[in-house]
C-alpha cells in the first residue's frame, strides 16, 4: 500500500514539473515566431529579389534575400508575403520561383513544392455566372373594332319617288275636246295619195334602141350626099 501511494505521489510530482516546462517551451516558440514575424520585411526583401533575382539564376546577391526571407523571416509565411508584393508580380516571379531559388541557394528547409502549395493555399471556388433570363415580350392586343355611330335623324334616307299611273295623269289633265287629235298621235297628211308612175314595159325599151340607130345612119347619109 505504501509503495502504491509513493508511486502516485511521484507521478503527480513529475506531471507538475512537466506542465511548466511545456508552457515555457510554448512561450519560447511564440516569442520566436513573433520575433521572426517582426524581422520579416516583405517590401524590402521583395525589392532586393526583383533587382537581383531571375528564374533559375541563383546568384549570390539573389540568394541572400531569398534565404533570409525563409530562415530569418519566420519561414514560409514570410516568403508568401514577399511573393505577394507588387514588385515581384511586375517582375513575373511567384512563390514557386522563390522556393526553387531557395532550394538552389542551399536553404535549411527542404520541400519547396510543399512550401509553394502552402503559399498558394486552396483555390477559391469558381464563381458561376448566371445570365439573366431574357425579358418576356408582351404581346399587344389589337384594338377592338368600334361600331360606326348611327346616322343622325336629319340624314335619314328619303323614300323612293312613287310611280304615278297614267290614269291619275289623265284625271289631272282632263278630257280632250272633240275633234282634236290626241297629244301623242303623229300627224297624218289628209287627201288622196299620188299614184306611182306606170312602169315601162320591156318591149318598148327594146324597140327604141334600133330606131335611134337607124335614124342616126340616115342622117349621116344625107349629110354626105349633100356635100357631093
From Swiss-Prot:
GO terms for biological process: pollen exine formation. Residues 145-162 have a biased composition (Pro residues). Keywords: Cell membrane, Disulfide bond, Glycoprotein, GPI-anchor, Lipid-binding, Lipoprotein, Membrane, Signal. Residues 1-24 form the signal peptide. Expressed in young panicles. Specifically expressed in pollen mother cells and young microspores. InterPro entries: Bifun_inhib/LTP/seed_sf, Bifunc_inhib/LTP/seed_store. It is a lipid-anchor; GPI-anchor. Pfam families: LTP_2. GO terms for molecular function: phospholipid binding. Glycans are attached at residue 94. It is found in: Cell membrane. One of its GO terms (cellular component) is side of membrane. Disruption phenotype: Abnormal exine pattern of pollen grains and complete male sterility. Gene3D superfamilies: Plant lipid-transfer and hydrophobic proteins. Disulfide bonds join 40-62, 63-105, 78-119. Its main location: membrane. Residues 124-207 are annotated as: Disordered. Plant non-specific lipid-transfer protein that binds phospholipids in vitro. Required for correct pollen exine patterning by controlling the continuity and homogeneity of the primexine distribution. Belongs to the plant LTP family. This is Non-specific lipid-transfer protein EPAD1. It comes from Oryza sativa subsp. japonica (Rice). The gene is EPAD1.
